[in-house]
Amino acid sequence: MSKVIETKQQVVTEIAEKLRASKSTIVVDYRGLTVSEATELRKNLREAGVEFKVYKNSLTRRAAESAEMAELNEFLTGPNAIAFSNEDVVAPAKVLNDFAKNHEALEIKAGVIEGKLVTLDEVKAIATLPSREGLLSMLLSVLQAPIRNLALATKAVADQKEEQGA
């Protein structure tokens, strides 16, 4: 086998593994972004723990088929970049959606969230969700509210008794 074919097979295997391992994968068309805008986007994604790569569509198609995500192939036309996140489902959608609001050249095409193909509208809906940490803090405040209210009520009763006794 030639060295070129071996290299391409390694890339296909790498993409397929990333597709299988990632909780969230978003495909975007980056045509029209300047170098500085693309660098800014990569920096924002890196800070959010998201990997952003450009692969050849033919290699990505083969990888999607081997990862049993062949439905993604219809979106692999033109210049594409793929954002992979192994930790946070919301992070790539949020960063890409926020960046696309300010830079019309970036077009979100589709995504795969936990193995399920999602459309542009679904990606935008996911982008509006709070992050995992945000959801946990909301849950924590909801769980603490009854205890806090009980403590405040007890303190109010104690203050009232103290006033009556004085």
Swiss-Prot record:
What keywords were assigned to this record? Ribonucleoprotein, Ribosomal protein, RNA-binding, rRNA-binding
Q: Name one GO cellular component term.
A: large ribosomal subunit
GO BP annotations listed? translation
Checking Gene3D superfamilies in the record gives: 3.30.70.1730, 6.10.250.290
The protein's GO terms of the molecular function aspect are:
large ribosomal subunit rRNA binding; structural constituent of ribosome
Give a Pfam family name: Ribosomal_L10
Q: Report the CDD domains cross-referenced here.
A: Ribosomal_L10
Q: Could you tell me which InterPro entries the record lists for this protein?
A: Ribosomal_uL10, Ribosomal_uL10-like_sf, Ribosomal_uL10_bac, Ribosomal_uL10_bac_type, Ribosomal_uL10_CS_bac
Q: Specify the superkingdom.
A: Bacteria
Q: Which PANTHER family match?
A: 39S RIBOSOMAL PROTEIN L10, MITOCHONDRIAL
Quaternary structure and interacting proteins, as annotated: Part of the ribosomal stalk of the 50S ribosomal subunit. The N-terminus interacts with L11 and the large rRNA to form the base of the stalk. The C-terminus forms an elongated spine to which L12 dimers bind in a sequential fashion forming a multimeric L10(L12)X complex.
Q: Which NCBIfam families does the record associate with it? A: PRK00099.1-1 (NF000955)
HAMAP family under this entry?
Ribosomal_uL10 (MF_00362)
Q: Which family does it belong to?
A: Belongs to the universal ribosomal protein uL10 family.
Q: What does this protein do?
A: Forms part of the ribosomal stalk, playing a central role in the interaction of the ribosome with GTP-bound translation factors.
Query: What name goes with this protein?
Result: Large ribosomal subunit protein uL10
Q: Which organism is it from?
A: Bacillus mycoides (strain KBAB4)
**Which gene is the coding source of this polypeptide chain?**
rplJ
